Amino acid sequence: MSRERPPGTDIPRNLSFIAALTERAYYRSQRPSLEEEPEEEPGEGGTRFGARSRAHAPSRGRRARSAPAGGGGARAPRSRSPDTRKRVRFADALGLELAVVRRFRPGELPRVPRHVQIQLQRDALRHFAPCQPRARGLQEARAALEPASEPGFAARLLTQRICLERAEAGPLGVAGSARVVDLAYEKRVSVRWSADGWRSQREAPAAYAGPAPPPPRADRFAFRLPAPPIGGALLFALRYRVTGHEFWDNNGGRDYALRGPEHPGSGGAPEPQGWIHFI
């Protein structure tokens, strides 16, 4: 029993071959400029097997291309500058921007009104006041000291060989003087002081300021110290070295204490502030 050969116009029922033909027809309609390989109609004997081999064998030198999304021509690539940066913006519920950028020049410092600075410093002192060590004798600290006007000053000077004459705290620092008994021509007088309750200390030399009124026979030395800290006290003691001996005046072991201003701007003459609004 013989089987008849199908006519040449009969398309074999092969799904892969049909899919290949459909894909070629789609790309030909979308990309007319693409070159298609010439197809030769196979002979009578190689119709079925030649079509199958072309459907399964991959074409050489060709790459698969995806169809354009819009169905139109090729889209031109978007040019992007290397300096282009992406920006991200944040907005609140009303659509307003949450971030505000302000640019400052290094040479131009922002101008802050003086009353704002005073308020900020006052708040900082109130916040950190419990953390600061309380200087010894802070309750007894005063803005000015004048031991020379007290009774018994001459007797105390003879006993100690050195005594504080006067000291006063101002906005620019402390100015004071001391008297020392004239025991020799060469003598050295200095002031040891501290602004943090003697956790740290420094020593400042005193300069000869001439003879002091008798009695007893004595010389006067003047000194200058930094201003007391705000809300605190400056502690100091006097030191006298002469002929290999050393004498001290530390207010009977309590140290001398000068009180600073309670808050910034409390000392000195008030400064005008109206012109700040016109900067």
UniProtKB/Swiss-Prot annotation:
Tissue-wise expression: Expressed in skeletal muscle and heart with barely detectable levels in liver.
UniProt key word Phosphoprotein: yes
BP GO annotations: glycogen metabolic process; positive regulation of glycogen biosynthetic process; regulation of glycogen biosynthetic process
Annotated Pfam families: CBM_21
Keyword Phosphoprotein: yes
Keywords, in A-Z order: Carbohydrate metabolism, Glycogen metabolism, Phosphoprotein
Source species, domain of life: Eukaryota
Role of this protein: Acts as a glycogen-targeting subunit for PP1. PP1 is involved in glycogen metabolism and contributes to the activation of glycogen synthase leading to an increase in glycogen synthesis.
Domain comment quoted from the record: The CBM21 domain is known to be involved in the localization to glycogen and is characteristic of some regulatory subunit of phosphatase complexes.
Name used for this protein in its record: Protein phosphatase 1 regulatory subunit 3E
Lineage start: Eukaryota, Metazoa, Chordata, Craniata, Vertebrata
Gene name of the record: PPP1R3E
